[in-house]
Amino acid sequence: MASLKKSFFLVLFLGLVSLSMCEEKKRENEDDAEDGNHEEESEEKRGLVDFAKHVIGIASKLGKRSEEKRYHPFGKRSEEKRYFPIPFGKRSEEKRYFPIPIGKRSEEKRYFPIPIGKRSEEKRYFPIPIGK
């Protein structure tokens, strides 16, 4: 009888241990499956959220542009052009009043169509270069 009790408890213990191990594996598999489904759902949600943010960003930019057009119908840069048809700046001032750019080199070109210099004078009077 004692040996029967021992064998019965041994079988019962081993059976319960194996059952608990099987249940743990099932739970792990179910958790993995749920995590996989959850990841897919979260990816879909992320995609929708990103798309919504993108649409909202575009709409806000369009709203800003329409406000700018309301207050600046020609744009900030074109406001200058509205009052100053010629671009206003240091370089453009020279072009506005002096059609030929002013500078040491350009002054020579303005009054002397042929460049003046030691080498160019030789070419002017002597077509064949003369060297020393």
From Swiss-Prot:
Keywords: Amidation, Amphibian defense peptide, Secreted, Signal. One of its GO terms (cellular component) is extracellular region. Fallaxidin-1.1 shows no antibacterial activity against Gram-positive or Gram-negative bacteria. Does not inhibit the formation of NO by neuronal nitric oxide synthase. Has no effect on splenocyte proliferation or smooth muscle contraction. Residues 23-46, 66-70, 78-82, 91-96, 106-110, 120-124 form a propeptide. The modification Phenylalanine amide is found at F74, F88. It is found in: Secreted. Coiled coil: none annotated. The lineage of its organism: Eukaryota, Metazoa, Chordata, Craniata, Vertebrata. Residues 25-47 are annotated as: Disordered. Belongs to the frog skin active peptide (FSAP) family. Brevinin subfamily. Residues 30-42 have a biased composition (Acidic residues). Expressed by the skin glands. Its main location: secreted. One of its GO terms (biological process) is defense response. The keyword Secreted applies. This is Preprofallaxidin-7. Residues 1-22 form the signal peptide. The modification Leucine amide is found at L62. InterPro entries: Frog_antimicrobial_propeptide.
